């Protein structure tokens, strides 16, 4: 090969091996800019989480406070938890849940202790990738789940058991639920871990302080008689080691005021507990007897505040002479 031909061959080889100019790169050479959520890289949509049970929803609000995590309420606020399964199983409730599930990454449930909680199975119909966070018991088993009372364990697990004898009325159980949710949400949204853990610490501190103060005051009481107006506050009485007096509400509402007066005179409870405010006639009978009425609502917007307020109110009532 003569010298000009050899130089031409070297020039051709160099041209083939040289990197392409920046302006020559076509669309096929550009990496994907789409995330799993369909948003441009660096602009991913915030974590979206579905919840329905009022205590789970209210607790989750406290945990995600100050973060971009979005909570989707799957059932109307005024709908009791006992009616949520039927609402979500069909019609408007199911349609809205499926629509929300398509854009969500996780659901918060109580399925391990409340088998009628079908929020996750229903949401999974619309989104096979959605994750379940069971607030009562972590699936991985790395964190402790909530403790159930002996009476709850004796009965078959079902909707009535856990919704009547509510384990989250024990401050230790409510703190565990918060821990489970915060841990799982931190793993799903790592950039929010610091704020989520700070919110968890604040919740735990509020519950611990209330429990400590309530225990201190209860220790000073010589006896702890309490009248449970409804069975849904049994767990609170058990957690505080109160002494429920013998009592059974009459079948007819119009007989309640007289029955209350009789029970108060016979047993002299230092407080009356209920999960809802009684009607006017019953409230007047309680007020006339001079016994504090303490209401722990199971649909309070902030279940942490509701529980701490109830614990301290009970302790103050028991400690009074």
Specify the residue positions occupied by each region the protein language model found.
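Twin-arginine (Tat) signal peptide motif
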Residues: 2-6, 10, 128
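Short, intrinsically disordered or compositionally biased N-terminal tails of bacterial proteins
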Residues: 2-3, 22-25
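Bacterial N-terminal signal peptides
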Residues: 8-18
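Extracytoplasmic metal-acquisition and chelation regions
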Residues: 24-321
